[in-house]
């Protein structure tokens, strides 16, 4: 005969059992549930703070940035061998464009761009796609039309789960990519010749022009073919790091 344990020794299976009080059991499970809920909330908060879900870029004051765009000249900067947040692009027959990079907004994008500049990747590349009142795009092809590849980088923009709040206003630099692949940006960049709000959230803006918007405008005005390629090559002679003199 099977038996059960009780406080008074064995009890027969068919013996009348006292009715159990489940109050303490219910309270215990409610307490456990509340504890698990609180712990889950804490974990989520911690992971959100470290960028595990939707990374938070630096807050951006677009009015301040607009006031910075094209506020200086190339003569306000000096070349340096150090990796900095300032890059000067020299365009043959056109002049110089000085960029300020913003790693606080798009860190991986800036890191990739700095790596390419340091390697001399942009020397003798062209602006191969030019659309006036929109943008100038380059960095991936040389004058012969040969495409040069580079490592891809995760797309740091909101459509790809990253909180990039730098808007595509005139003078902003951003990464080109394949339309169907958010993580396909590599070496091709574009500079906005006009505000292009339809790009916000879908492309990784990572800096802006501090000097040389007249150069950008001159390039944007060149004659192009049906594929938006300039008839005459617009050649990037070099891209180097610079430091402000003041």
For the regions a protein language model found, what residue spans apply to each?
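Cyclophilin-like peptidyl-prolyl cis-trans isomerases
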Residues: 2-246
